[in-house]
Amino acid sequence: MDFREEYKQKLVSADEAVKLIKSGDWVDYGWCTNTVDALDQALAKRTDELTDVKLRGGILMKPLAVFAREDAGEHFCWNSWHMSGIERKMINRGVAYYCPIRYSELPRYYRELDCPDDVAMFQVAPMDAHGYFNFGPSASHLGAMCERAKHIIVEVNENMPRCLGGTECGIHISDVTYIVEGSNPPIGELGAGGPATDVDKAVAKLIVDEIPNGACLQLGIGGMPNAVGSLIAESDLKDLGVHTEMYVDAFVDIAKAGKINGSKKNIDRYRQTYAFGAGTKKMYDYLDDNPELMSAPVDYTNDIRSISALDNFISINNAVDIDLYGQVNAESAGIKQISGAGGQLDFVLGAYLSKGGKSFICLSSTFKTKDGQVQSRIRPTLANGSIVTDARPNTHYVVTEYGKVNLKGLSTWQRAEALISIAHPDFRDDLIKEAEQMHIWRRSNR
C-alpha cells in the first residue's frame, strides 16, 4: 500500500497543528531527544490565547520556547518525569514540577492515567515505506503514551536516527492526526560532563576489576560510568552484553573496541538492548539503522524480571551522597530536585537477583560547595529533605576512590565501619563521632 496520499492529507504547518490545543489540556511534548521543536515554537505564539495548559516530558536538552516569557507560568505548567539542568532552572522560576516515578512503571502510568493526553506530540524519523514513523532513540514509554492520547502530532526530523528494536518503536500513519515537517534541527546532544578526573579513573578501576568476561552491562550517565566504559574498552574483557535503561557514548567505545557481542546473554542474544539514548552525534550515527541495537519500551528494559534473567549483570550508577545506614540519594540536594529516580532502583534490585550479578553505586568521596568548602559525600544521615532513591536493604556495592564495600547482610555498625573506611580520610574521625552518637559504632572497631 502507498501511504503518500494519506501523508499529504495529514501534512499541515506547525501553526495549524497546535490549534488542536485548548486551555486546560494535558499535552505531551515527547521525551529527551524527540522533544518537539517547531511545534514548541508554534505553541509559544498562542501563549496569550491559552491558560492552564499542562505539558509533560523530561530530560530537556534545550530551553522551551513556551517558557521564554516571564509570565509563562500563567499559561503553561511543565511536568517532568526526569529533570535536566534546564528543568532545574524552570523549577526555580515556579513553572515546572517533578513527577516522582519508578521509570519501569511509566508505560503503565500512561495506560491508567486519570488525565490522559489531549494531545501527544513529538519528533520522529521520516516515514518508512510501510507507513511507520520511528521514535528514534526513545522507545521508552512513547508507545503507551500514544495509546490513550486523543490526538497525535508527529514532527518529522530528517536527522532523527532510525532505531531498530523489538516492539513499540514507532507509530503508524493511520494513528496520527497531523504530520508537521520541521526545520530538521540537529538532535540534542548530551555530553559526559567533561573528561574523566583522577577520582573517576580510580573508581572505574575498582569496578572493572569486578567485571567478568561475558558480563551484561548497564551504565548510568556521568563522568564515572563513562570512565568505567573507557577502561573496559582498554581492557582484556570479552563477550560482553548490554541491557541498559540509557544508551550512552561509552557503549559505542566499548563496542568499537570489539568487547561487545552479546553472545553470553540469556535473552536478546547478540543485541544491545536499551530504552532510550542520549549522547553525541557519534552515538546517534552508531544507533542509526544498526541491527545490533535493540530499542525497547522501558517496562521491558527496566523490568526486574528481564534484568535478573541475565547472568553476571553489572549495574553501575552515580549517587549524590549516601548515609551511614546505606541509604542512597541519587536525585536531590536536600529539597532541591536535581534529576530523578529514573531506573536506578530497578537495576539495583535486578542486578542482585541476577546469577553472579552486582550493583555498584559510585561517587567521589568529597565535593566542593559554591563557596569553595569541601564536604563529604558520605554523611551520618542524609540532608533534611534529601530523597532516598535506594533504600538501605537494597544497596549492594558502594565505591569511592578510597575503595569498595559490599553492604549486603551487614548490621548498622558494620555498615558504618565499611562506609567510613571509604570516606575521605579528613572526614573519618568526624563520621566516627557522629556514628557513636547514633549508636551505630562499636568502640572495639578502633
UniProtKB/Swiss-Prot annotation:
Optimum pH is 7-8. It comes from Roseburia hominis (strain DSM 16839 / JCM 17582 / NCIMB 14029 / A2-183). InterPro entries: AcetylCoA_hyd_C, AcetylCoA_hyd_C_sf, ActCoA_hydro, ActCoA_hydro_N, Butryl-CoA_acetate_CoA_Tfrase, NagB/RpiA_transferase-like. It is an enzyme of class 2 (transferase). The fermentation acid butyrate is of special interest, as it has been shown to serve as the preferred energy source for the gut wall and also influences cell differentiation and apoptosis in the colon, and this seems to aid in protection against colon cancer and inflammatory bowel disease. Formation of butyrate via butyryl-CoA CoA-transferase is the only available route for butyrate synthesis in the majority of human gut isolates. The lineage of its organism: Bacteria, Bacillati, Bacillota, Clostridia, Lachnospirales. The keyword Transferase applies. Coenzyme A-transferase that converts butyryl-CoA to butyrate. Can also use proprionyl-CoA as substrate in vitro. Keywords: Fatty acid metabolism, Lipid metabolism, Transferase. It holds the Pfam family AcetylCoA_hydro. Belongs to the acetyl-CoA hydrolase/transferase family. Butyryl-CoA CoA-transferase subfamily. It catalyses: butanoate + acetyl-CoA = butanoyl-CoA + acetate; propanoate + acetyl-CoA = propanoyl-CoA + acetate. This is Butyryl-CoA:acetate CoA-transferase. Pathway: Lipid metabolism; butanoate metabolism. The active site is at E245. Its EC number is 2.8.3.-. PANTHER family: ACETYL-COA HYDROLASE (PTHR21432:SF20), ACETYL-COA HYDROLASE-RELATED (PTHR21432).
